[in-house]
From Swiss-Prot:
Protein name: UPF0306 protein PM1958
Pfam families assigned: PNPOx_N
Signal sequence annotation: none
Family under the similarity heading: Belongs to the UPF0306 family.
InterPro entries per the UniProt record, alphabetical: Pyridox_Oxase_N, Split_barrel_FMN-bd, UPF0306
Record organism: Pasteurella multocida (strain Pm70)
Length: 149
């Protein structure tokens, strides 16, 4: 993944997650940590929530990570697609430990750990020029050259 995209995702802390069941959309906001090595977002939630039940039947998701602004020249944000799944055993323990490097509230150990395995990411960054975008797809080899530097 391009360094600018990684840096943006790592700097933020909240994402929206959209899922569907029977053609009915549902969206939520979650605090997350980014696992750069695995290109995934780690989040926690209750296992009996509506979205958790939906995700068990349809893991395909879309989402956004953005910095709210009314000033168009400073607009920055990510749109993504991927697959979300609950983690168990060692995977859950490792992901929970990563999550705890950023968050410390008492519910972390009581909730289930989930991931979004990113498959497509599109960064819109107007600081690079109006409506400038950088895209990444799972499996893509990324150039090290930053054409925006």
């Amino acid at each position: 993944m391009h360094k600018r995209v990684v840096d943006f995702i790592k700097k933020q802390y909240l994402f929206t997650l959209a899922c569907t069941e029977n053609n009915l959309p549902w969206a939520n906001a979650f605090y997350y940590v980014f696992d750069e090595k695995e290109n995934r977002l780690i989040y926690i939630t209750g296992d009996q929530t509506h979205h958790a039940k939906v995700l068990r039947n349809n893991s395909r998701v879309a989402g956004t990570i953005f910095v709210p602004t009314k000033f168009v020249p400073s607009l920055q944000g990510v749109q993504f697609t991927g697959r979300s799944s609950q983690l168990f055993s060692t995977q859950a323990e490792q992901a929970r430990a990563l999550y705890k490097t950023e968050y410390s509230h008492h519910l972390i150990d009581q909730l289930t750990v989930w991931q979004v395995e990113l498959e497509y990411v599109r960064l819109v960054d107007n600081s690079l020029g109006l409506f400038s975008t950088i895209e990444w797809r799972k499996g893509q080899v990324v150039e090290e050259t930053d054409h925006y530097a």
